[in-house]
């Protein structure tokens, strides 16, 4: 039941944010009484905390499961495409919602962000090849991270308004433009 509560809470928090999600919403989503939630969790903050933790664990697991050993420009393109469009949309939306998380969770969220950024940095650096890329390592990483953050923000809206297929087509054009910026001619 604890896992089901968190799974449903992730959906609710991703759609309504922390403030918009109530314990009533969560209890109804798992067909239990609100009082029964307290058997499993102390309060809404604890449920949110666990939801955020699961979100970051999902991203790290996704990164580690979905890379391949093709550390080329084509491999980078495939990696970016997977990391944007194959991630469960609930986690993208929850990630975007973190900017309005309770202040009491700021240090935990910062820790999770640092952990995911380290994992992502370590994965992206494998694609860096100075014989093909005109930027230094840090500029390369920063440009890719900026691109991903922008796409996650955009994808959260695309999912909401049902235009994800159009976004995939634009992504192809934009990632080629991005790659052309830092590829040596």
Curated annotation (Swiss-Prot):
Domain HTH tetR-type: 1-59
Domain of life of the native organism: Bacteria
DNA-binding region: 22-41
Pfam families: TetR_C_37, TetR_N
Gene inactivation effect: Cells lacking this gene display a 5.8-fold increase in ica operon expression.
Keywords: DNA-binding, Repressor, Transcription, Transcription regulation
Induction text: Repressed by ethanol.
Molecular-function annotations in GO: DNA binding
Subunit structure: Homodimer.
Role this protein plays: Represses transcription of the icaADBC operon necessary for biofilm production.
Miscellaneous field: Binding to the ica operator DNA involves two IcaR dimers and is highly cooperative. Two aminoglycoside antibiotics, namely, gentamicin and streptomycin, show an inhibitory effect on the IcaR-DNA interactions. Consequently, by interfering with the binding of IcaR to DNA, aminoglycoside gentamicin and other antibiotics may activate the icaADBC genes and elicit biofilm production in S.epidermidis, as a defense mechanism. The four antibiotics kanamycin, tetracycline, ampicillin and chloramphenicol do not show significant effect on the IcaR-DNA binding.
Alphabetical list of PANTHER family matching this protein: ACREF/ENVCD OPERON REPRESSOR-RELATED (PTHR43479), ACREF_ENVCD OPERON REPRESSOR-RELATED (PTHR43479:SF11)
UniProt name for this protein: Biofilm operon icaADBC HTH-type negative transcriptional regulator IcaR
Organism of derivation: Staphylococcus epidermidis (strain ATCC 35984 / DSM 28319 / BCRC 17069 / CCUG 31568 / BM 3577 / RP62A)
Lineage per the UniProt record: Bacteria, Bacillati, Bacillota, Bacilli, Bacillales
């Amino acid at each position: 039941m604890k896992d089901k509560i968190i799974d449903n809470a992730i959906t609710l928090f991703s759609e309504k944010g922390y403030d918009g999600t109530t314990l009533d919403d969560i209890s109804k989503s798992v067909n239990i009484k609100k009082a029964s939630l307290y058997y499993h969790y102390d309060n809404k903050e604890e449920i949110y905390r666990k939801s955020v933790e699961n979100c970051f664990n999902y991203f790290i697991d996704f990164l580690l499961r979905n890379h391949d050993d093709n550390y080329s420009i084509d491999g980078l393109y495939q990696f970016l495409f997977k990391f944007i469009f194959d991630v469960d949309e609930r986690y993208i939306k929850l990630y975007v919602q973190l900017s309005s998380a309770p202040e009491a969770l700021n240090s935990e969220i910062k820790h999770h962000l640092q952990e995911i950024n380290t994992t992502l940095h370590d994965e992206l650096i494998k694609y860096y090849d100075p014989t093909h890329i005109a930027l230094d390592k840090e500029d390369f990483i920063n440009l890719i991270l900026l691109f991903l953050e922008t796409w996650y923000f955009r994808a959260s809206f695309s999912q909401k308004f049902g235009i994800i297929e159009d976004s995939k087509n634009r992504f192809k054009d934009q990632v080629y433009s991005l790659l052309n910026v830092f590829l040596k001619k």
